[in-house]
Amino acid sequence: MALLQSSLIWVVYAIVFFLLVAVSSIFIYIYQTPSERSTYVTTVCIFTLTALLATVLLLPVDVALVSSTTSSREGRRKSWATQDEVDKITFSLAVAYYFLYSLDAVLCLLVVPFTYFWYEEYDEVASEDGSQTFRKRFWGAFKYTVAFILLTVILFLVGFFVPIGRRKDKPNLDLDYFRRLLTENHGERALTFALGLLITIGILVYVLYTSTGLALLPVTIIKSAPAISSPTLSANTASRLEENIERQRQLEGRCGGNPDRLPSKQRRELDSLVRQARTLRRRQRLAEEARRPSGSWLLNAWFKLSAVFRPLKLLSGLLLLAIAMLVWVSMLLTSIDKAMNSICKQNCGYILGKTNILNPINWVFVHSSKVFPVDYILFVFLVLVFFCSSVVGIATTGIRFLWVRIFQLRKGHTSPQALLITTVMLTLITLALNYSISMVVAPQYATYGPQTFCDHPPKHPGEQPDCTGLEPLIKPCSELSENPTAKEICTPTVVSTFLNRITLNFPFFGIVDFWAQFFFLGLSLLVFLVTIFRTPKLDEQQFDEDAEAAEEEGLLASTGRRFGATWEDITGRASRSPQVSGSAGRGTRE
């Protein structure tokens, strides 16, 4: 029975893994620029996103496996759950976590930077005449990646030798649970330090982008920007075009049709009016094409379905808003609980030994975890909400260095370099999200799940306690349980042990990670208040630039062709028409 149950849990995880591959692929193909598509960049981005999401979504498997050793109704271990069997379960989970965490670190610090420089090393002319070989390109990318290799080696060496927290300095850490967290293995300590540093860096990115996206995501679904074909914009465009033409006539009348006779100021004004008129006519044409019935039955059906399901879009936005508010409240309650009731405060990174304030998200997950995979479905949805919020935050804020925008994440217009940097940012955010969900959003669920213990002395030494008819004595597991039988019954999840080990051995990381949650809550509230009172507008300048570039590439011949291009972005298959090279004079790059 135990083998069958654990096998089914891993099968569910495998199904989720393949779904993650699909989600990552769709995300990459939707956002990348078709004319600059690169096989290597696409593969690395999809693989990296899948690996990092698989790391976070291992948590429900962790909870389900350790919880399967106990009966939450009776508060005791099941007959088959000997300590050897429990150790086998936790060991298999530890191997999976260390593999995924190490893979995430290698992808973030080595593979993605190498792919970035590999793409930058591409020279179309040299590649066509044969002067740029695979070896030269590889060596050129490797030279720049050496700095990241040295950074990774230094990071692990520092973690190998850096001093850790000692129990003699922390009088509140005499419990067996906390003693076990003090790492003595140098290899494990190096990985703990490296991931602790990456999580702390990720927390900073998480606070800036995910908090912004969590506030923007539901509001942008409820209040979307008007389309180019909306009556108001069309009327405004027609009015501006009419005024433009009238002003051109006035200026041409003054010069008798010869612009050289105009003063330099009015000549510049006439040139500006001509360019503006060209842009306004393009907008008019695109608006007419958008309103005109298409010959494609698929496109017409899509427009009709969009109109029919528009109320559902509003309802989904309201549902996301309710979920975002619930998550915000849950994070606030747990953060207050940690600040007030942590047994060791800043000495251990505000580890919370027991949940003292009711957390609605935590309550839902603890009770739903009694019926696997209900909690897994809810957890996948929660992670995707955070993931989409991070994407929205990056797309809105842009990839910046200080206040300078370096790259922009936009659907169908994201360069390979921007995709790779976005992937690194999402990797750091997801590592931070692993901490935030486990320690702040749902701490009891992520630590013990639905596990309980019978707080009643056993009838005979060596036996398990029996709470038959004594249901009030069946209590949730916690690190602060004084009953020695609780330590024999309750098994903490592997991920909670690992994260608590980081904050206990390196308290600085725990302090930064904890107080950053308040900045997350404050920034998301500020962005939400600003967004809710702000009317979304069409970015006309960006629209004109995109339309002009697409017009030059011959991609706006008809509405049907534009729909086909969008479908190609999603499926990743090129059309049968001749390929048009990108702005740099190249097609698909390897």
Swiss-Prot record:
Subcellular location: Lysosome membrane
Highest taxon in the source lineage: Eukaryota
Signal peptide region: none
Record membrane topology: Multi-pass membrane protein
Pfam family, one: LMBR1
Record-annotated membrane-spanning stretches: 8-28, 46-66, 94-114, 145-165, 190-210, 314-334, 348-367, 376-396, 421-441, 508-528
Record InterPro entries: LMBD1_LysCbl_Transport, LMBR1-like_membr_prot
GO molecular function annotations of the record: cobalamin binding
Segments of this protein annotated with the region Disordered: 567-590
This protein's UniProt keywords: Cobalamin, Cobalt, Lysosome, Membrane, Transmembrane, Transmembrane helix, Transport
Single Gene Ontology BP annotation: protein localization to vacuole
Gene Ontology CC: vacuolar membrane
Major localization listed first in the record, in broad terms: membrane
Protein task: Probable lysosomal cobalamin transporter. Required to export cobalamin from lysosomes allowing its conversion to cofactors.
Family label: Belongs to the LIMR family. LMBRD1 subfamily.
Name the record gives this protein: Probable lysosomal cobalamin transporter
Native organism: Ajellomyces capsulatus (strain NAm1 / WU24) (Darling's disease fungus)
Lineage of source species: Eukaryota, Fungi, Dikarya, Ascomycota, Pezizomycotina
